[in-house]
């Protein structure tokens, strides 16, 4: 992490935690709330923005529509119906999902609404067939304690998850409807978080509390964190889709670096006398003829297919376009993002990176001359694509540069795997939300309150104390269990194997062994709970050694469909009898007799290393250690060195 004084720059972060609920049915129909890979029907739609009741068009919706996309929907036969296809009105809201949200609200001390009113939130990126997402506030206010700080909760909302994107080609985007309508709970905090580390701790605390309800899904894609980040003098930036908890601090740090860099660029532009009026008067120039003989593969490909190369002068911006604003991303990358999304092009080429990409110094001079620029102070950007796309993209570049005069634009960005972000769309306006007229309000009655009561999660501190008392877990191991997404499974297995397997081994299998495998890149999520339980059954019954468990999980993750028994046979992990272990250790000790006599008791490490190399996964390490120690003692005693 960098040494930024986050307090001095006025960092404020708000979190929105989105978590799928583990309900039997979807939020507005009776389809199962799970993913399905069965056969599917297909249909195609094109979505268009409409005016709100106040006559306004949401800018984010307009932005998506301008892409001219067509959407192909896969409708799995057992996991979607006419509601997902938007051919039938939604059913009444799922009371089970509302009860879970009420339970969470009680745990956070939030004020639960008297009636749940469903709203429509405009979304026309294709992820909702209707062109909007249904969402409903269940509670307001409350707080969660993180360390010594009470972090205020603003809203607790339930909403339907979006369709699952499975492919994209040209104008066509393919979505699968099994995920559309799965209930989500959204918990939004006030923007009072003041450091990247604190944001991670708050997200961890909320996630832990949700898991303790026993009513949330787990696995890849079931939880997502959105961040609202701002600094003094900057702007509120919404960052969507942070999938991993450990990525939160890096995403925030990089966003702070980006905003600080954009503020520096603003000051540089003002010092150089760049004005919005000047940028508005810049006209895109067709430089296709100047580059007709270019050796650039990008340019040649576009020109040969009837496209154009459009250049725009960026007055007094030499050296600024190539400035790094966060690791691996430059101001030119920001311009390219705008060009891609508003113009539908692949990207841009700018003068701060030229000569290069097959474009020569002579060609650079000709472009400067064509746009009326001074190579000593000005910059330019090139866009190569279909004429209409290239012109739109060039104007988007100019608009983004003009926005840089104000500093940091308000926008929505997408989180990337390395912690950086890219421009996603403009910030949505107030015209985005309007009432849902097809669903009657739901009164929070005694029935819902009674459904919620047993789901109210205990404080994590109370749960940790009970785990330590009942199962003898260490404080650290107890907290690791509570924070593990398999919490409910672990607790049930701690009880199942009471008196058969040590609780520390059972808990460690999940929070140490499985996490270690995940750290190695093993896709542990592919191994379902029943198989993990079967592995522990075989350990408890003495059929396999404890050390074999990790190898089995690794094999089964890489070979979905295999049974545990097949994996044991394939890997040769059937546990050896004590007599077989004794025989193998005897062979090793016999071959090292002289070394044992020379080293004495210090030979244990050498013999154990050789023994475990032969026996790993087929015999418990404790048994091997006991036999090795005894065999060495026997040799030393027989030689009179004991």
UniProtKB/Swiss-Prot annotation:
Reactions performed catalytically: L-glutamyl-tRNA(Gln) + L-glutamine + ATP + H2O = L-glutaminyl-tRNA(Gln) + L-glutamate + ADP + phosphate + H(+)
GO cellular component: cytoplasm
Keyword annotations from UniProtKB, A to Z: ATP-binding, Ligase, Nucleotide-binding, Protein biosynthesis
Single Gene Ontology MF annotation: aminoacyl-tRNA ligase activity
Pfam families on file: GAD, GatB_N, GatB_Yqey
BP term (GO), one: glutaminyl-tRNAGln biosynthesis via transamidation
EC number: 6.3.5.-
Function: Allows the formation of correctly charged Gln-tRNA(Gln) through the transamidation of misacylated Glu-tRNA(Gln) in organisms which lack glutaminyl-tRNA synthetase. The reaction takes place in the presence of glutamine and ATP through an activated gamma-phospho-Glu-tRNA(Gln). The GatDE system is specific for glutamate and does not act on aspartate.
Family: Belongs to the GatB/GatE family. GatE subfamily.
Protein name, per record: Glutamyl-tRNA(Gln) amidotransferase subunit E
Lineage summary: Archaea, Thermoproteota, Thermoprotei, Desulfurococcales, Desulfurococcaceae
